[in-house]
Amino acid sequence: MAVTVENLEKLERKMTLTLPLNTIQSEVATRLKKLARTVKMDGFRPGKVPMSVVSQRYAYSVHYEVMNDKVGEAFAVAANEAKLRVAGQPRISEKEDAPEGELAFDAIFEVYPDVKIADLANAEVEKLSAEVSDAAIDKTLDILRKQRRTFALRAADEPAQDGDRVTIDFEGKMDGETFAGGKAEDFQFIVGDGQMLKEFEDAVRGMKSGESKTFPLNFPADYHGKDVAGKQADFLVTVKKIEAAHLPEVNEELAKSLGIADATVEGLRSDIKKNLEREVKFRLLARNKNAVMDALVTNAELDLPNASVQAELERLIENARADLKQRGIKDADKAPIPEELFRPQAEKRVRLGLVVAELVRANELQAKPEQLKSHIEELAASYEKPQEVVRWYLSDNSRMAEVEAVVIENNVTDFVLGKAKVSEKAISFDELMGQN
């Protein structure tokens, strides 16, 4: 087999392959004979169809199949011998000027780039830190108490206030007509919890049981109901029942109800702090990891294989369609999604993947067995039966591959932070959690 490789633009290459014609013909004949032993045709017994008939019927498809197989095998062998790291699938076409007795093909393809990472000592990375404060523990305690709150009927002359559960009938109209979803009976919500629009809650707050009120309400322009978004409606609301919330005290009983081993107030707060610290650790790791990855992309030079970018584009668009379908969007699989919407993201992902792969290879940052074990145990620690979670991960190769990818990213993060110019920045617990 004769092979030549020509450099085209940037990462593009052209390989010319020459194969003996008799190799193709011999394989076609072998496959046709094998096919003749099992093929079924009207008028013939199984395995008794004449070769001339089998050849007439199947020669073209078998020849096409053999050509694909042989050329694909030849390309793979030649690329391996030439130490070419092929990105994507080659575009193969037959040449017309092949020497007699031979078949010649051109394969145009891309190779993965050489990745040049600048000196990481000059890279700048902002590393975040955060602590679990007493205020964060108190806020979590309040959430836990609200989840276990009970309600008692208010006196008839007591107005609705924040935290109360109200039962109402309401009807909203536009131009005198009730709109879809604008009417309900015995509807319940907690005043001040943000379940309803602020204008609606403001109108109900202060009303008493048995009271009715009519008021205008302006729907926001970005309201999820497109038929009413940006419009004004007139609502009639009748309050049927008001119930005041009663939160459990922070005591041993609450600790017991939450399944805390040390069923004391101190034990409860300690358990909450431990869980919050675990969450803080994971969130800080994610934020700092993103900062490191951004620094890596900035400090690397490389060309991107179009084949890899296109494959990533198609994956992102497919994910977008699946998301639309999950949201109940009609004909989501046919919705036109411009590639350019996702191109920057696809290019960044491909670039980052190539840079990380090179950094891992050059610095031996692969995941070690003890790291995988430690990470799985850490993930499982927050569950009631951690050993079952550990077994769940270990029993599936795809789940283990995900764990391995995370550990490698963590190794890369630690490696870069150990080399780069790192500036420390302390942020509040609420800022880290995205809370106001």
From Swiss-Prot:
Residue stretches spanning the membrane: none
This protein's name: Trigger factor
Domain notes: Consists of 3 domains; the N-terminus binds the ribosome, the middle domain has PPIase activity, while the C-terminus has intrinsic chaperone activity on its own.
Sequence ranges assigned to domain PPIase FKBP-type in this UniProt record: 163-248
Record flagged with keyword Chaperone: yes
Known role: Involved in protein export. Acts as a chaperone by maintaining the newly synthesized protein in an open conformation. Functions as a peptidyl-prolyl cis-trans isomerase.
Keyword terms of this UniProt record: Cell cycle, Cell division, Chaperone, Cytoplasm, Isomerase, Rotamase
One Gene Ontology term, aspect cellular component: cytoplasm
InterPro entries, alphabetized: PPIase_dom_sf (IPR046357), PPIase_FKBP_dom (IPR001179), Trig_fac (IPR005215), Trigger_fac_C (IPR008880), Trigger_fac_C_sf (IPR037041), Trigger_fac_ribosome-bd_bac (IPR008881), Trigger_fac_ribosome-bd_sf (IPR036611), Trigger_fact/SurA_dom_sf (IPR027304)
Family note: Belongs to the FKBP-type PPIase family. Tig subfamily.
EC number: 5.2.1.8
Main location: cytoplasm
Reactions that this protein is recorded to catalyse: [protein]-peptidylproline (omega=180) = [protein]-peptidylproline (omega=0)
Localization in the cell: Cytoplasm
HAMAP family: Trigger_factor_Tig
Keyword Cell division appears in the UniProt entry: yes
